[in-house]
């Protein structure tokens, strides 16, 4: 639906539709060369077309979805929840205690529902249980929300790494910024 809102304010007010963002990308460059969000997704997660350029998930002029590209992206890992569900027996053991997500509950690009689905899956894991965390910015926190400064986030990450570092692994130098 080209007139669907693609970007909104944290209060839920429309900022830009799919059509508007698609037109902006077309004006910035054709054949996946705008260097904007949609073209980046297509180049990163989509297949290469016969012409050597990334195939588009949807036609930026008409909004028509290319189902082959959608299937390719899902099967190749663009859908993180699907990838984790499909591969949990193999990759789950190496991810235990390592997945910690921060997100606003009113993401500008409608990503919060996908995060809720990811959390539902991870909370259902067994053998092994994922052992991570989800923190939501509420009420009405948008894209890029985090509950701390970047410096505080780095300190939290350093403490986590130090806590789980292999026995005897030196961590003092990098924790103190040397």
Per-region residue spans from a language model:
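Accessory cap/linker subdomain of secreted extracellular hydrolases
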Residues: 1-94, 108-112, 124
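C-terminal catalytic histidine-bearing segment of alpha/beta-hydrolase fold enzymes
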Residues: 52, 67, 82, 100-178
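A general structural motif
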Residues: 96-98
